[in-house]
Regions:
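Structured catalytic cores of large enzymes
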Residues: 3-262, 266-267, 273-279
């Protein structure tokens, strides 16, 4: 961009969109909304972006299983939507990320279906698992949520910093199940500013447990940054998007999505032609 002061940002980020689409929601979100940015005196442009994880009012994480990143569109024009530093910091102070820490690795599927992935590391009675989570300050209070999966019925003991906080139980799986899931939230005290050690120990010696995620809510929020001196993550440029007017397109019965490099265009066109000929 020749003039950064004209940069405008649009999009919704990576948050999970409602899976029940109403007329009001569609009308509200039909066009991408511009996102307010904060312009600093040193030329930096700050955006409070949303990734694929958000939090509800009960401190439970909401994962968008269809995205690993939050994406926004950049363009330029007159009168970008901006907010001052005071408003930006006020918004930041109420942001849920300041009071939550998440551990989640998605690299294992129990079966070829569904949308939830799990941590590939096997947790057994002989090989318990320890995870370290960041806090905000020593002697803090909060809550710990553990969600896991198991191939057979077992209780799992949960400890935090050497203290037992409770257990959660996965029930026996059905005849056509590969596993069952369990989740529980525990109140915790005497949290540390860093290196809170969470330990998971299955009781059933035969059970194999795999973690979905662990989230920690700490009552004390992270410190508010000094905008003038703090460093912030910078986004990556994924690519260019051509101007388009999707509103001009007619209704579609099927949409085929292919990579941007168009390597699958021939196959996609063949599939589309088949459906146009055979579908009624």
């Amino acid at each position: 961009f020749a003039d950064p002061s004209r940069v405008k940002v649009y999009g919704y980020g990576g948050a999970l969109q409602p899976e029940w689409l109403t007329a009001d929601y569609l009308q509200t979100t039909d066009d991408l909304h511009e996102v307010a940015t904060c312009r600093l005196s040193d030329g930096r442009c700050l955006l409070m972006a949303t990734g694929p994880v958000t939090w509800d009012s009960n401190h439970q994480r909401i994962r968008n299983p269809y995205a690993n990143y939050g994406c926004y569109f950049l363009t330029e024009g007159d009168n970008p939507l901006t907010i001052d530093t005071e408003t930006f910091l006020t918004n930041w102070q109420s942001h849920a990320d300041r009071t939550h820490t998440l551990y989640e690795v998605d690299d294992y599927a129990w079966y070829q279906g569904g949308r939830n992935l799990y941590d590939a590391t096997r947790i057994t009675a002989a090989n318990p698992r320890s995870i370290t989570l960041q806090g905000a300050q020593d002697h803090d209070t909060g809550s710990l949520t553990v969600t896991l999966s198991a191939d057979q019925a077992t209780a799992v003991m949960v400890g935090v910093n050497g203290q037992n906080v409770g257990q959660l139980a996965a029930v026996s799986r059905g005849e056509y199940d590969e596993m069952r899931t369990a989740t529980a939230t525990f109140p915790v005290t005497e949290l540390l500013a860093a290196n809170n050690k969470v330990t998971l120990t299955p009781v059933n010696a035969q059970a194999v447990v795999r973690l979905d995620h662990i989230s920690l809510y700490h009552a004390t929020p992270e410190a508010t940054p000094n905008l003038a001196s703090a460093t912030f993550p910078a986004p990556d440029i994924v690519g260019l998007v051509n101007n388009q007017n999707l509103h001009a397109d007619g209704p579609a019965d099927m949409i085929i999505i292919i990579p941007a490099d168009r390597k699958m265009q021939e196959q996609a066109q063949r599939l589309a032609d088949w459906h146009e000929t055979h579908d009624t």
